[in-house]
């Protein structure tokens, strides 16, 4: 499929590095998205929000069989999207969730991720491909993909620009996600430990034994 030139870059963020599949980055994004899905599922009005989104083009009738991690691999492999472009796509999804009633669910996650990265490519990179090419990667008919793009533009309210400071802060969060998750996990275990006040609990969870004993003694 031949490529065509798109508009030049209109952002301060560098997306010029050679594209390749960044497994570390994609795994971190997968963890973030998985956490968001679980947190949304725990919402009291989750079923109500699911029902309110059923009529949207962004919502699929069935859960995709391909995992979101494999889907991310597929997207970066075929589009050759830069790492920073992938991150910008994630930031676009955050913006939409912040300024609309949309929440991430297993029924809209894949479509939102694909269209977000597609828009990030169009807005931040010099070269893009024809719609037919993107539709094949997404596994969505061309007409439907165009509808998804229009819906996405309306949801984000044409707010595609991302400043360098905002990007750097977001990227730093992704880079440190493992540390943040460890902190969250430790706080969860420490809370249980305080409730149980039981050394045996820590012995059964060796990862927290040393720190836990210090808290227990002091």
Task: Identify the residue ranges that each predicted region occupies.
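Acidic, Ser/Thr/Pro-rich regulatory low-complexity segments at or just upstream of the first helical elements
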Residues: 1-84, 88, 92-102, 164-218
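Alpha-helical segment that forms one wall of the substrate-binding/catalytic cleft
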Residues: 89, 113, 152
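Hydrophobic residues within the alpha-helices of tandem HEAT/HEAT-like
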Residues: 93-97, 120, 157
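Short helix-interrupting loop/turn segments at helix-coil junctions
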Residues: 82-84, 120-128, 162
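Intrinsically disordered, low-complexity regulatory regions enriched in Ser/Pro/Gly/Thr
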Residues: 80, 105-112, 145
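Channel- or pocket-lining gating/hinge segments that regulate access to a cavity or pore
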Residues: 129-164, 168-175
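Short conserved catalytic/interaction loops centered on acidic-Pro-aromatic/His motifs
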Residues: 103-107, 123-138
């Amino acid at each position: 499929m031949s490529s065509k030139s798109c508009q030049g870059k209109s952002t301060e963020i560098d997306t010029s590095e050679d594209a390749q599949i960044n497994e570390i980055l994609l795994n971190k994004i997968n963890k973030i998205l998985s956490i968001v899905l679980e947190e949304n599922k725990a919402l009291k009005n989750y079923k109500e929000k699911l029902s309110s989104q059923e009529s949207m083009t962004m919502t699929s009738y069935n859960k995709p069989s391909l995992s979101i991690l494999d889907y991310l691999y597929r997207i970066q492999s075929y589009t050759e999207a830069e790492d920073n472009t992938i991150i910008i796509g994630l930031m676009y999804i955050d913006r939409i969730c912040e300024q609309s009633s949309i929440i991430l669910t297993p029924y809209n996650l894949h479509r939102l991720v694909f269209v977000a990265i597609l828009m990030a490519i169009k807005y931040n990179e010099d070269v893009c491909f024809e719609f037919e090419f993107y539709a094949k990667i997404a596994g969505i008919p061309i007409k439907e993909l165009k509808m998804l793009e229009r819906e996405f533009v309306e949801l984000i309210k044409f707010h595609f620009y991302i400043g360098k400071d905002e990007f750097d802060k977001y990227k730093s969060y992704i880079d440190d996600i493992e540390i943040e998750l460890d902190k969250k996990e430790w706080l969860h275990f420490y809370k249980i430990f305080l409730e149980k006040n039981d050394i045996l609990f820590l012995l059964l969870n060796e990862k927290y034994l040393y720190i836990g004993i210090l808290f227990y003694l002091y």
